[in-house]
Amino acid sequence: MKKLFLNFCSTLLFLIFASIIRANADELFNKGKEVFLEAGNCAACHTLYDAGSNAMIGPNLNEIRPDIQRIIMAVRNGIGVMPAMEGILSDEEIEAVAHYVSISAEQ
């Protein structure tokens, strides 16, 4: 009986932590989408289907499917005609938009 109770408690704790992690990931995704569409104005130049953007100045993010590190580097430092956003966007906003783009581009 004690073992059954311990298994129940550990399963319950796992589910609680999993839901907290999921909520944080959803919050980060939504913040990233907001940055993509508004603060960063990424949609003005990039195509990303999830954001409903169909611009042709920068690369189509659905086609190149960049990983998080590549996105962070490009957003912070700029690349080609894309301006550096470090100092314009906070580190939190840069991480959020990188998270959003990396997940959305995979779909």
Q: What are the functions of these language-model segments?
A:
Residues 55-107:
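Extracytoplasmic electron-transfer domains, predominantly the class I c-type cytochrome c fold
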